[in-house]
Amino acid sequence: MVLLKWLVCQLVFFTAFSHAFTDYLLKKCAQSGFCHRNRVYAENIAKSHHCYYKVDAESIAHDPLENVLHATIIKTIPRLEGDDIAVQFPFSLSFLQDHSVRFTINEKERMPTNSSGLLISSQRFNETWKYAFDKKFQEEANRTSIPQFHFLKQKQTVNSFWSKISSFLSLSNSTADTFHLRNGDVSVEIFAEPFQLKVYWQNALKLIVNEQNFLNIEHHRTKQENFAHVLPEETTFNMFKDNFLYSKHDSMPLGPESVALDFSFMGSTNVYGIPEHATSLRLMDTSGGKEPYRLFNVDVFEYNIGTSQPMYGSIPFMFSSSSTSIFWVNAADTWVDIKYDTSKNKTMTHWISENGVIDVVMSLGPDIPTIIDKFTDLTGRPFLPPISSIGYHQCRWNYNDEMDVLTVDSQMDAHMIPYDFIWLDLEYTNDKKYFTWKQHSFPNPKRLLSKLKKLGRNLVVLIDPHLKKDYEISDRVINENVAVKDHNGNDYVGHCWPGNSIWIDTISKYGQKIWKSFFERFMDLPADLTNLFIWNDMNEPSIFDGPETTAPKDLIHDNYIEERSVHNIYGLSVHEATYDAIKSIYSPSDKRPFLLTRAFFAGSQRTAATWTGDNVANWDYLKISIPMVLSNNIAGMPFIGADIAGFAEDPTPELIARWYQAGLWYPFFRAHAHIDTKRREPYLFNEPLKSIVRDIIQLRYFLLPTLYTMFHKSSVTGFPIMNPMFIEHPEFAELYHIDNQFYWSNSGLLVKPVTEPGQSETEMVFPPGIFYEFASLHSFINNGTDLIEKNISAPLDKIPLFIEGGHIITMKDKYRRSSMLMKNDPYVIVIAPDTEGRAVGDLYVDDGETFGYQRGEYVETQFIFENNTLKNVRSHIPENLTGIHHNTLRNTNIEKIIIAKNNLQHNITLKDSIKVKKNGEESSLPTRSSYENDNKITILNLSLDITEDWEVIF
């Protein structure tokens, strides 16, 4: 019943919405030459059952120094007359240290093209991994002779090839054309003809590569010889031209270059990931003529909902509910088809990229968190942001001048609405020239920053990679030869906010250096002013007169790299260069940067937050924001939110209230509005809306200790902050379809925002166990072994929010104007026992703003409640605790403990005193000022330091 209701709601939602974005600007698969060709090829191969790719068994070699298996894949093109054509593709396969499997298929080095004046490399781009993988892997790669990556450290010399066995890798052949590799719990079978891989976890088949024989690599050929190089199942549609209206000038200097491969996820009919798309968390089936999912960073103002169209960011990472994942390491335009086969309990996927190489990392494990952990270990952990940046952000396009900013600042205080960041959009600049200030509006930025700093507040300004022609900054970019070039080698000029613009080439190392120098001058501030941060928008890149709202694919970057090859990592290169600049500038204070990017790729989580882009103030966009934020969270980039309460158009009061109630749970909590909308700072609202929004924002601040602990967990393991229910309860099949209700990390906080108008109640899904309504701590129990649905009251001023039994929440419950002013406040512990009377919770504390935590300057502890006793069990304290405590950690005391009550045998009652064990001594503490009601016990006036081990016996 739960699943049926969800499916009905999804059908109504996605069919009722009227599209806002102009669809005709973006290609459909049938209009994309390489997508159409590969779909046709797949359809024809499925009918003919032919296979043209095989492993040359004689080429297989295993270098014990590298622990990498090398081979050659042969593509045979049959000819009616003369000899068949054979094309060679070098293949490598190896294991990462976490037992993930990486394989690559490249094209044997191409002969230089005969085309005169070619300004790009004729070789396939094989360096996406250098942008996507974390530096620790890149550094390891650079210490070896392997051009891609050094995976295995143990070395062993043996006499016979088939006896090459190490503790990492065992290799054998069981038949003439089948080879077996094993690494811990993971094993791989390589089938030579037709080429195929089968990947096993603990001897269970989890993934089949090329099961459908969709492998297709459009090898290099000239237009004149093309006819002889086409397979019978192929079409020649748009191989050497692009007839799409908005990209018909693409010179396509290397002709067809696409790569494609199919992957079958066994034992699962649920797959997730490949953000960013405005659709359901569980990826849609795209068979039967539907559009594939597209990964291609573009500017989609008022994007369409319920479609597989591309958006601002791309993370080519997908996993199944059977805890198996693939990471398609390719930054080119990419399409992904998905087909669920419930009769065989498997999911078939088809990945198609315009060019580059096939570079895939396959991970397997016991559960989905392990898969996400492996992915973020490879691509880099999400950065630990300043605690201020997980507070509330107030933004609009635009705050007009310094007085406008300071008026917002003072009015927020006057109405007791906390906030930490205020933002300046495009109009703060002088004539839309980045790295400048509009002098009559912001005559003294240092003065403005100083005033904001008094209460610990921060300013974010917009700086985009497009630079107005003919001013100092763009002139230097041109003079230093670090502008992106057109296909003729001239500085590319396109249209964006300033009019005619050029684009900085941050793919270039020297371009990054020049970009950094601009920030060094722009952020030349007194040493004590470290509260200016940056927003990189429009970095897909967005080009108003460009094809599909973005860059022509035949633009040229440094080192003869074509835009076609690196499109989806351009935005990452921009924001990483910006992050490095800010980090360097603030290094004397050791301050952590905060940075927002609109475009992203795998690895962007290392340095930036993001948001869902230019949404609209209506209920459909509120509803879709939840699966969108969830999708990024499970794909390794958790620091994301959506513009509250819609960027474009004016929201109703009801929508504002409901959107703040949903936005409270976004990891990135920002209100933003278009320049043409009415002002909607929270203090301008009429009652009761103003009080509702104020209370929501205050609740976010009360929960900052728990939220910051979640961010720390994510920075260590990649664990989602907004967390799908199926990750916490994978045993229930129905939860794999739920994306309108979620947990906050592993805290036990379970929430379902109201996303439809006129609702005063909602249906929530609860697994077995006890749940406590957050505000009252009133409890109810699901005594069964299955999920139940329960009708929950949800008037406009109430969030459907529960604590799952077995968890402990840490809070600070005093109103302060910003997060900095909360540092000296004590903690409040909320204990929600499970049906056995137990509960556990974690707390992480550092200074919230510097990199001191990387030097061990933090406290990490776990609260354990059982047998009516609360224990504090520290897992880490700083070596120099006294100095660190005084200067950075500030107040580490627990002042109040709240224990939720229930009607079970483990329930407790308030006694005249409690016992405290600390430092080997036991004392009795009176509870005269404490109190009790039907739902909870509140114990006050405590002084329990989280940096010490102690027990409290109730």
Curated annotation (Swiss-Prot):
Q: In which pathway does it act?
A: Glycan metabolism; N-glycan metabolism
Query: Does the entry feature the keyword Ion transport, yes or no?
Result: no
Which reactions are catalysed by this chain?
N(4)-(alpha-D-Glc-(1->3)-alpha-D-Man-(1->2)-alpha-D-Man-(1->2)-alpha-D-Man-(1->3)-[alpha-D-Man-(1->2)-alpha-D-Man-(1->3)-[alpha-D-Man-(1->2)-alpha-D-Man-(1->6)]-alpha-D-Man-(1->6)]-beta-D-Man-(1->4)-beta-D-GlcNAc-(1->4)-beta-D-GlcNAc)-L-asparaginyl-[protein] + H2O = N(4)-(alpha-D-Man-(1->2)-alpha-D-Man-(1->2)-alpha-D-Man-(1->3)-[alpha-D-Man-(1->2)-alpha-D-Man-(1->3)-[alpha-D-Man-(1->2)-alpha-D-Man-(1->6)]-alpha-D-Man-(1->6)]-beta-D-Man-(1->4)-beta-D-GlcNAc-(1->4)-beta-D-GlcNAc)-L-asparaginyl-[protein] (N-glucan mannose isomer 9A1,2,3B1,2,3) + beta-D-glucose; N(4)-(alpha-D-Glc-(1->3)-alpha-D-Glc-(1->3)-alpha-D-Man-(1->2)-alpha-D-Man-(1->2)-alpha-D-Man-(1->3)-[alpha-D-Man-(1->2)-alpha-D-Man-(1->3)-[alpha-D-Man-(1->2)-alpha-D-Man-(1->6)]-alpha-D-Man-(1->6)]-beta-D-Man-(1->4)-beta-D-GlcNAc-(1->4)-beta-D-GlcNAc)-L-asparaginyl-[protein] + H2O = N(4)-(alpha-D-Glc-(1->3)-alpha-D-Man-(1->2)-alpha-D-Man-(1->2)-alpha-D-Man-(1->3)-[alpha-D-Man-(1->2)-alpha-D-Man-(1->3)-[alpha-D-Man-(1->2)-alpha-D-Man-(1->6)]-alpha-D-Man-(1->6)]-beta-D-Man-(1->4)-beta-D-GlcNAc-(1->4)-beta-D-GlcNAc)-L-asparaginyl-[protein] + beta-D-glucose
Give GO MF terms, alphabetically.
alpha-glucosidase activity; carbohydrate binding; Glc2Man9GlcNAc2 oligosaccharide glucosidase activity; glucan 1,3-alpha-glucosidase activity
Q: What else is known?
A: Present with 238 molecules/cell in log phase SD medium.
The UniProt family comment states: Belongs to the glycosyl hydrolase 31 family.
Q: What is this protein called?
A: Glucosidase 2 subunit alpha
Q: Which gene encodes it?
A: ROT2
